[in-house]
Amino acid sequence: MMVFQSFILGNLVSLCMKIINSVVVVGLYYGFLTTFSIGPSYLFLLRARVMDEGEEGTEKKVSATTGFIAGQLMMFISIYYAPLHLALGRPHTITVLALPYLLFHFFWNNNKHFFDYGSTTRNEMRNLRIQCVFLNNLIFQLFNHFILPSSMLARLVNIYMFRCNNKMLFVTSSFVGWLIGHILFMKWVGLVLVWIQQNNSIRSNVLIRSNKYKFLVSELRNSMARIFSILLFITCVYYLGRTPSPIFTKKLKGTSETEERGGTKQDQEVSTEEAPFPSLFSEEREDLDKIDEMEEIRVNGKDKINKDDEFHVRTYYKKVSENRDGNKENSNLKFFKIKKKEDHFLWFEKPFVTLVFDYKRWNRPNRYIKNEKIENTIRNEMSQYFFYTCKSDGKERISFTYPPNLSTFFEMIQKKIPSFTREKAPADQMSAYWSLMNEEKKNNLKNVFFNRIEALDKKRSFENILEKTTRFCHNETKKEYLPKLYDPFLHGISRGKVKKLLPFQIITETYINIGLGGSWINKIHGILLKINSKKFEQTLEKFNRKSLSVEKKLSFFSEPREEKSHSDEEIQIFKILFDVVITDNNNQTLIKNVIYFHEINKSVPQWSYKLTSELEELEGENEENVPTEPGIRSRKAKPVVVFTDKESHNGIYTNLKDNQNFDQKDEMALIRYSQHSDFRRDLIKGSMRSQRRKTVIWEFFQAKVHSPLFFDRIDKLFFFSFDLWGLKKTILRNLMWKKKKKKIDKNEEEQLKRKERRRMEIAETWDSFLFSQTIRGFLLVTQSILRKYLILPLLIIIKNSTRALLFQVPEWSEDLKDWKREMHIKCTYNGVQLSETEFPRNWLTDGIQIKIIFPFYLKPWHKSKVQSSQKARLKKTKDKGEKNDFGFLTVWGMETELPFGSAKKKPSFFEPIFKELKKRIKKFKRKPFWVLSIFKERATILLKVAKEIKNWILQNLLFLKGKIKNISKQNRMPLFDLREISELNETKKDSIMSNQMIYGLSVQKKSMEWTNSSLSENKIKNLIDRIKTIKNQTEEILKEKENLTNTNRCNKPRYDSKIIESSKKSWQTFKRKNIRLIRKFFFFFKFCIEQLFRTIFLGIINIPRITTQLFFESTKEILDKSIYIYKNEENGEKNKNKKNTIFFISTIKNLISKKKIFSYDLCSLSQAYVFYKLSQIQVSNFSKLKAVLEYNICITSFFIKNQLKDLVQEQGILDYELKDKTFLNSQVNQWKHWLRSNSQYNLPQVAWARLVTQRWKKKINQDSLVLNQSLIKTDSYEKNKFDKFDNYKKQNFFEANSLLNPKLNLKKDYRYNLFCYKFIHSREKMFDMSIGIALDNCLVSSFLEKYNIRVIEEIGHRKYLDWRILNFLFIKKVNMRPWVDTKSKKKDSRTKVQNYQKIDKITKTDLANKKSFFFDWMGMNEEILNRRLTNFEFFFFPEFVLFSSTYKTKPWVIPIKLLLFNFNEKKNVNKKITLKNKGFISSNEKGSLWFYNLNKEENGLAGQGELESDNEKQRNPESVLLNQEKNIDENYAESKIKKRQNKKQYKSNTEAELELFLTRYSRFQLRWNCFLNQKIINNIKVYCLLVRLKNPNEITISCIERGELSLDILMIEKNFTFTKLMKKGMLIVEPVRLSVKNDGQLIIYRTIGISLVHKNKPKISKRYKNIDKKNNYDCFIPENILSPKRRREFRILICFNLKKKNARDRNSRFDKNIKNLTTVLHKKKDLDKDKKTLIKLKSFLWPNFRLEDLACMNRYWFNTTNGNRFSMIRIHMYTRFKIH
């Protein structure tokens, strides 16, 4: 029965779920929801129900309801029916139709009373009222829904259409659901109206019943039509606001460009720009200059290009061909002409369609704004997205990276050839065919690969085994190839850069170098476009076939297994399509000087992007090349002139422009922003604000623009929310903390923000209304005059006259002096001070502020000038600093600290008077109470005497008590005697403990006794025996008493007596133990306190020692390092060993946690000594050391054998388990095994120790490094690579030679690859990983160093700078060249800096002519003075090396001191450096910058030099050396810049340094310190005032006192250097994180540079110089057998794994693949035995299921980047998978 019930219940649930998820129910639900999207159509529906009555009213109601339902039905049908959707879905269509109709209906209803509304006839067809109501409701229902804030409800039906299969049923059910909801809504409205009519309470209202209000109600009924017309008008206005009206939008004056794209993504990329279409007309690279293929600029929309099909073929030609008879004929060129017959109606058709019906609008701008890095409309780094259908995974899908050329071509074919159709195969056949094709491709690739490997086993030539790249060849005999630029088989690095012609560049005669010949016709153009009236078959006969041959030496499909027969039609189509270019020798036309470039293109509208803002226009009014009209709306700003130079110019004007501007006055202006929200937010002109993010205004004055999304998070108005919690907090705060001083917290910050917002609102109010600034300006000037000349003099007269009446001396002179001191300075609207008399320009319209300096406050009396004491002086200065002696005048005559701020509190005139009165009253009150105070003093003396008498009596009583106690002690029991002894012991123990000094491990504790009593052990034993005897005696006495009581009682024992006895016994034992506990508790408590005291006392003792030692060590080491920077490391270590250290560490844990001062040689500690120390300490006290030894297992493993560890473990001293029992060869999971073998990502413990800021012991690291010296200094392959650099430079391996000598090129390529393979895993010797030293990871560990206070001194003497600290990027390419004589003993190194302009290729001649040298790669750490400052041209891809990338990969090339030489200005040494005074530098002489290396012993100069930039040569300035004398500290390098100043051109030292700093060295982000921004603005405001004053001294001093003028920012010195700016903290040099676009070669170069770890290898043998003679490619890398393209294809096909997706485990299949390949390659079974002789097969060659293979697929399929740049990164990512 239960089963049956559950079965029924389950069926019911499933049935309910099916019903709920059915199409009908979902449609009903969504249709019902759309009812709530209320639109303007409800206005007409409600109007018909409310207003119309009678028979005509009922008809109108029916027609309104019918029209309403019909309109909604049309909307639902438009979801399913595409033409109706297109007609109703276009927003402009509805706009154009709706707005005129709405306006007409509004005016028609508004002027209704003009028509005759008498008795109507029954002929309603003539009246057409009912039809109008029907049309109103029908049309308004088609409008967009707008009343609800979200239109999501109306769109739910559209959204669900994508999920629904039975669409028609869904549309029908949704309409029924909407109809049900509409009926319910109308019923509810009717019920509400009926309830209002029938409700007695409303009808019986006194107001309504009164005659006065009856008239109003009747008027309301009569004016109902007017109310609805007003609502209709609001609807019209709302639609006008929302409507994107393209007719009235502003078109930008700039060119709206149309970019003609015909190629792949490379058109848009800067680094690898390619031709858009492979053309055969340009065989040489120089032909690129002839082609303007990239852009066609349409100026102001004048060039209209065949917009019918949006395709065209562009041609450039110079002359029209002539035939031999002299008759002009261009029959072959007809298809190149643009049809101009359509121009007469295009002016009407195209603009009308574009303006009205194109919602994207041709003049709609995009948000691509010009940037330093981005010049184009679309970012070059972005992927190319083009949607089209394609076959993927055997199914037809939408591809988002479909080639646009292919789709364009396909559309052209479909339009021009109507019979061209595609047959769609079934989905099953497509997927099966796709899988079969991919399987066949995979098998073919696999067979080819195995065949190549088997050929290698047969010892064939390796060069012939490699797969060759294929190239297009169009002349087999001469072997003339297609240019690399147009060769589709070549990709990546072989492609060059396309040089674009400038816009509007005309093809001149010099470009016409094409030979005369037959008429060249593109056959695809001939097919698609009508050339002439000849038939297609006739033109085919005239084709002179000239096919393109392809050179393929080793192709995967070069030898097909079966010959396939092809039909004649296939051959003919093949000839037509693949013989792209044909010649027609029968043509009788002779072409003279004609050049044609044909290209299939599709016009793509390109939006304007090089826009400037209004602010940039204001800033660059005086500059050239600034567009006249800005394209971006900035925040409203006005230039406020703050200074005008009225002096006449006496200079000589040589320029015409200067002569024209001679009469103009030089003005300095500041930009003033309006004090309201920026609703523009960089809005582009021509775009619509309605399409931006919603910026809703809900306040009259809104300080900040907000979106409605964040409406709940902002402070709302009072009627929106009532903050009870905030009110409660304020009440509690007022109750509890009235008298306490409040601290600055978040609430006060909020108050300040609220005040600032209030101030901005007031400013916005004055700035927004018309003539408000004029009114305010007049009021301010009036208030200023009244205050200065009327109110204040009147107050002075009243005050002094009252003083005279009160018989006091008047203060006329003091008051008048203060009155004259008050200044009313006119300021601009934002507070820039001008002067007392000068008004700002346009102050009536722009606004004005009046600032009062030294405001006059009326005082009752003036204090005497004689200062009474130092305290009064200090108080005066303090008050002066706190008081602000200025304020801004308000309209009401008040003062504020800030413009539009709250009124400032004035010092009260009567407050000092009241204070003085209070003082006088207090003095008067004190006189009657003098007698009482004297009496109080005498009473205290009497009390003291009484206390002394009392104390004397108490002492005597205590003495008598003591005597009595001594007498009673003689008869005391021995138990109390024992207590006395224990108390004595305690006191003695306390005295001993207080005098005991606690040291570290040097103090050896012989016993664990807690007392150090002077009693001997015998006495203690005797005492214990006595206690036992006493206890026994007492127990015997108690037993005897019990026996006596028992005998007196009955013989029969009772049950109650037993209970009583047991309770008595338990009570006695409890009492006894309680007494013992009470007796011993005091000593136990004292013992605990002593233990705590010991630990705390030890810590307190150690804290000052630790701090003092750290302080002394850090300061001493910093001083040592700063004085001896370039000293040898050995001397430094000797100095370290000589230091006097304070030994304060007590445990091994402290020794380990200490970072710098651990100089013990742990290896010298004998194990006997260690265990002797351990045996001396008791096990119970060993808990401190136990945790330390267990935590630091790796350290104890150095000096403790395993046997001794076991012994210690057995004794219970240490729970020790050997951590490193499982080595790498253990049988563990393969995945874990592989991860563990990846030592690149498994950081050593040294790195982790540095990360957690624990410095491990230096000696252990050195010992382990010494043990593994063979690993570092082996004659490995990487060491040999650098030795070959001389030979490499002599042979000049560059592009030209690489083409001539392919064998050397191949050899070089395999040396690179083999070097990377061997280097990464050349050191795989097994050693104890618990030591934490992994020699492969020196690079990682060196970069993971964190600087703290204790190691900060190491930064100064570091040999090289970590490039992660400062990121260098050169604006121009800098070529650093060495001039170093390695044989000479002079320690002179200078580096030459040259500036080149941006060029396409780095020239190779300068590189080749360099002096060949061997870069001392491994000797940089030994002696810094011998190091040359060179830019080592790395032998991997030397053409692509820049200085910045070189420094990033090899930061040790230039030390810090030489790199940042410009900031190391010292004035300690009196050694002066002077430069050569040369008159001029010739233009042929190359300027150089020399660095000075100062030797400490010699104090001599290393070199002298000068600098001159190419940019200065172009401007031809003749600089004069500034006679500066700079003192340079020892061991620092500094550059001197030689500048010669021209008489015509004056440059300060600051400008010269700024120019040098920004243009030559590196790009930094120079930002001001954040707190200086307001200071600088305040300084500028004060400067504007001081410039106008004749005697500015007093104002300057007062401004400095007030803090308005900060002296650190004043540029007092003329020669103000960057060093001083940086020292003051004004200028901060930060590294710039710029997005640098690197080409592929640079990425590969940097990837290889990661693996080249810098090691200390000072010497390299000369016998490796002839390393080039060795055939390194004999030890091949299997991945390079296949070409990169086939490699990727093979990997992707393997990843698909078409048939065996779930057949086996991935790891097993992976292992099998590896084993099969390794058995073919190497017949030896074990790969791990001899690692030096075998080249290991890397598992990354076959990444079946690795992460980066997915990235490769992404690049291969989705066209994110070009070329195979992931292979070099993969080298370092994965290691060989071990096979056991």
From Swiss-Prot:
There is a partial copy of the N-terminus (positions 1-344) of ycf1 in the inverted repeat (BAF50422). Residues 254-268 have a biased composition (Basic and acidic residues). This is Protein TIC 214. The gene is TIC214. InterPro entries: TIC214 (IPR008896). It comes from Draba nemorosa (Woodland whitlowgrass). It is a multi-pass membrane protein. Involved in protein precursor import into chloroplasts. May be part of an intermediate translocation complex acting as a protein-conducting channel at the inner envelope. Keywords: Chloroplast, Membrane, Plastid, Plastid inner membrane, Protein transport, Transmembrane, Transmembrane helix, Transport.
